[in-house]
Amino acid sequence: MYCPFCSAQDTKVIDSRLVADGVQIRRRRECLSCTERFTTFETAELVMPRLVKTDGTRQPFDEAKLRAGMLRALEKRPVSMEDLEAAISRICHRLRATGERELPARELGEFVMEELQQLDDVAYVRFASVYRSFQDISEFSAEVDRLKKAGGKPGDKLGEPKES
């Protein structure tokens, strides 16, 4: 690695530590020429799979687009940004874990719906209504009924009165 101070090529690693929950390595280095010290961070370059849409077109995975879609579903809902970011991280991990170079976009949609259902039922129904193209109120009602029957998750459930 080149020294950022004198551009010499020879440096030595003095210290290495895992940071960012083990997904990054922080290295403390020293230049063998000028003896200046500097820090570098090392992360694995992970390639996300391309998404194959229903019309057959392919597009690269876009985390910003994922975040925007989830934020739209979660608008004015009591879900923290930390919980949203954790859900996005889990979705990205699941996409990488498939090991595939290409995935159907509907698979990403299913991952998103699973995460939203854990975060907030209202956000889940909002997303599902667009994702599954609900045509009328009966489809909304059927999805809400299915959620009520599933139950078991603490937090904001559909159909339950709000506490004041």
Swiss-Prot record:
- Asked if Transcription is a keyword of the record, the answer is yes
**Residue ranges of the unnamed zinc fingers?**
3-34
- Report the record's Gene Ontology biological process terms: negative regulation of DNA-templated transcription
Please give the cofactor(s) recorded in the UniProt entry for this protein: Zn(2+)
What keywords were assigned to this record?
Answer: ATP-binding, DNA-binding, Metal-binding, Nucleotide-binding, Repressor, Transcription, Transcription regulation, Zinc, Zinc-finger
Mention any Pfam family matching this sequence.
Zn_ribbon_NrdR
Q: How is the cofactor bound?
A: Binds 1 zinc ion.
**Residue stretches making up the ATP-cone domain:** 49-139
Asked whether the keyword Magnesium is assigned, the reply is no
Q: Which domain of life is it from?
A: Bacteria
So what does this one do?
Negatively regulates transcription of bacterial ribonucleotide reductase nrd genes and operons by binding to NrdR-boxes.
Q: What is this protein called?
A: Transcriptional repressor NrdR
